[in-house]
Swiss-Prot record:
Belongs to the anamorsin family. Keywords: 2Fe-2S, 4Fe-4S, Cytoplasm, Iron, Iron-sulfur, Metal-binding, Mitochondrion. Gene3D superfamilies: Fe-S cluster assembly protein Dre2, N-terminal domain. Residues 21-150 are annotated as: N-terminal SAM-like domain. This is Fe-S cluster assembly protein dre2. It comes from Talaromyces marneffei (strain ATCC 18224 / CBS 334.59 / QM 7333). The keyword Cytoplasm applies. The C-terminal domain binds 2 Fe-S clusters but is otherwise mostly in an intrinsically disordered conformation. The N-terminal domain has structural similarity with S-adenosyl-L-methionine-dependent methyltransferases, but does not bind S-adenosyl-L-methionine. It is required for correct assembly of the 2 Fe-S clusters.
Length: 305
């Protein structure tokens, strides 16, 4: 019977090594590829930093995606550029956006990114700012974000109701300057002789009798109504007397009108001049103009000159 291979697990079931303190500050060193050829420089660097809490990664491997970093693990990220800045341009050229996409999640809140030879220049931190880091005293710091639940209010904000002003209740001794009661009686300001004086009517308020005729009241007792009626009657009689100068009846329209006879002339004395000069009731309206004294006959509604 052939023998079968046997695998033996030699790892201990219980690891009694001291657990790593999570409160210790960890440091990540980022080195350009050229520093690997100088072993003495790496030895000097590890003499400065504690190896138990310090990790070293190459920038070219980090940029190529060959290395993964733990999340929120480092308090300080130091880019090795030599103290004299000999490798500054090389290191900054490798700090691309892909490197920051891996580096930023590995930094703790408030962790800092620094250069070995000094602070970042104004034009050297563009990719760090785009990655979400904030400039602070020549270095870049990861801001400490806080998560909080915010309730969503979709309704309209209710307006605060303004309480009405309390109504003032008038009491004894309450003074209100906005009431309609007069504080001073105007009649008390006049003496007895002032009240007895006749009222002086201004000249501009007096009616102009020459231009405007006064009208009598409906129940006039001063005699103005009788005076106005007498004036109207006199004016009417005068107008009737002027109309009686020439008044033709219906049966007189067929008679001969002779202007040579005394008393047979019109009141306007313009009957012979034409329609433009004749009265409204003139019997010669529509006839042509004729000479004064010319015989005019109106027979069967036809004028014969």
């Amino acid at each position: 019977m052939p023998s079968l291979p046997v695998l033996i697990d030699t790892t201990p079931d219980f690891d009694f090594a001291p657990a790593q303190d999570a409160t210790q500050k960890r440091t990540l060193l980022l080195a350009p590829p050229s520093i690997a050829a100088h072993e003495e420089k790496l030895r000097d660097i590890f003499a400065t930093f504690d190896r138990s809490v310090t990790d070293l990664q190459m920038l070219d491997r980090l940029s190529a995606g060959f290395v993964t970093l733990p999340a929120s693990a480092y308090d300080l990220v130091l880019v090795l550029t030599d103290t004299n800045g000999a490798r500054r341009n090389e290191a900054l050229g490798l700090l691309t956006r892909d490197v920051f996409n891996v580096l930023t999640p590995a930094m703790k809140p408030s962790a800092q990114l620094k250069l070995q030879d000094g602070p970042f220049q104004a034009t050297e931190g563009r990719e760090a700012i785009l990655a979400g880091l904030v400039e602070n005293n020549g270095a870049f710091e990861k801001p400490q974000y806080q998560e909080a639940a915010v309730p969503l209010r979709f309704g309209l904000k209710k307006k605060n109701k303004v309480a009405p002003e309390p109504v003032k209740v008038e009491s004894v001794g309450f003074v209100d300057n906005y009431d309609d009661d007069e504080l001073i009686d105007e009649d008390d300001l006049l003496a007895e002789e002032d009240l007895g004086r006749p009222v002086q009517q201004p000249a501009e308020c007096k009616p102009d009798i020459a231009k405007k005729r006064r009208r009598a009241c409906k129940d006039c007792t001063c005699g103005l109504a009788a005076q106005l009626e007498a004036e109207d009657a006199e004016r009417r009689e005068k107008a009737n007397a002027e109309l009686n100068v020439l008044k033709l009846k219906t049966d007189e329209l067929n008679d001969e009108v002779d202007f040579t006879v005394q008393g047979k002339t019109g009141s306007c004395n313009s009957c012979s001049l034409g329609d433009a000069f004749r009265c409204e009731g003139c019997p010669f309206i529509g006839l042509p103009a004729f000479k004064p004294g010319e015989e005019v006959r109106i027979m069967n509604d036809m004028a014969q000159l």
